[in-house]
Design a protein with these regions (language model features):
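Extreme N-terminal starter segment of soluble prokaryotic enzymes
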Residues: 1-6
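Short polar catalytic/cofactor-binding loops
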Residues: 8-14
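Short amphipathic alpha-helical segment that frequently serves as the phosphate-/nucleotide-binding helix
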Residues: 16-26
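Cys-nucleophile CN-hydrolase/nitrilase-fold catalytic domain and related Cys-dependent amidase chemistry
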Residues: 24-105, 170-185
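Active-site neighborhood of phospho(di)ester-bond hydrolases with catalytic His/Asp-centered motifs
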Residues: 35-39, 80-84, 108, 141-142, ...
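CN hydrolase (nitrilase-like) catalytic-core segments centered on the catalytic cysteine
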Residues: 64-79, 147-233
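Active-site catalytic loop in hydrolytic enzyme cores
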Residues: 87-158, 167, 173-180, 208, ...
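C-terminal beta-strand edge segments of enzyme domains
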Residues: 130-132, 194-290
């Protein structure tokens, strides 16, 4: 069994050290194997300029947050997935780090940027990866990646048992969509969302929906947090459940795939719908006899 969970809270915009300290204070009090933190938990979400995003971004793995979380992970023998803005050369990325008892492991850069994120960040261009952390194999995705079912499918095909999903959800459909993603791939998912709202620089107010959750491979919501309260939740799961892809004795989720029919999924210029149809000739019916 594996003890997994999330920390849902309201990060203070621009207060990197305060946000990191709050996380360390809370995680220091629990016993867990894997904890997921929200997207951009160090910085907050609603940037008003690229310069502001650059100022709050950090290098990975040598930046402040990765170093502090690595110290915690070593002390607690803990794996952590945490979202933060990353600065790499002249590029900025909406990233998530994977940290373990031996320190920094890897980074995932968000593939599908949402709304004004496109003004500050570059989309991630690395392959979707799965990491073996001993008792489980995990993949990472960030927030709006949920809108694209291909992400979880690829991670699942690569053997992921658990999908770690840092998020700053503002759309209401994400939590329920993740239930479907888990069911259609037979994997666990841990969504770590934030609460509160941000309204900066005269921009539209963003209200974050909370509802962080852990979902099972059968689509069962094992736990869903509130919409507006800070919560640190840890529960036990058996990652081996995610390796049972049989739906029944005649159907296997992955073996039954018809990849010969799916070519359009990777075609940047999919075929247009058929517009011409062959009309059947009308046959004249004889008049009924009286």
């Amino acid at each position: 069994m594996l003890k997994v969970g999330f920390f849902q809270f309201n990060p203070l915009f621009g207060k990197v050290r305060a946000n990191v300290s709050r996380v360390i204070e809370c995680l220091s009090q629990v016993e867990a194997d894997l904890v997921v933190l929200p997207e951009l938990f160090t910085s907050g979400y609603q940037f008003v300029s690229r310069r502001e995003a650059e100022r709050l971004a950090e290098e990975i793995p040598d930046g402040y947050t990765t170093r502090r979380l690595s110290t915690l992970a070593r002390a607690k023998r803990l794996f952590i997935v945490a979202g933060l803005p990353e600065r790499k050369g002249s590029g900025l990325y909406n990233s998530a780090v994977l940290i373990g008892p031996e320190g920094f492991i890897d980074v995932y850069r968000k593939a599908h940027l949402f709304y004004e994120e496109k003004l500050w960040f570059s989309p991630g261009n690395s392959y979707l990866k799965v990491w073996d952390i001993g008792l489980a194999r995990i993949g990472m995705m960030i927030c709006f990646d949920w809108f694209f079912p291909e992400v979880m499918r690829v991670l699942s095909l690569k053997g992921a048992d658990i999908i770690c999903h840092p998020a700053n959800l503002v759309l209401p459909h994400g939590p329920n969509a993740m239930v479907t993603r888990c069911l259609e791939n037979r994997v666990f998912a841990i969504t770590a969302d934030r609460i509160g709202y941000e309204e900066r620089g005269g921009k539209e107010r963003l209200a974050f929906i909370g509802t962080s959750q852990v979902v099972s491979p059968s689509g069962e919501v094992l736990y869903r947090a509130s919409t507006d309260k800070e919560e640190l939740k840890i529960l036990e799961i058996d990652p081996r459940e995610a390796r049972k892809k049989a739906v029944n004795r005649h159907n296997d989720l992955f073996k039954d795939r018809r990849i010969d029919l799916y070519a359009e999924l990777v075609n940047p210029h999919p075929a247009k719908p058929q517009r011409r149809f062959t009309k059947a000739r009308k046959r004249s019916s004889p008049l009924p006899r009286s």
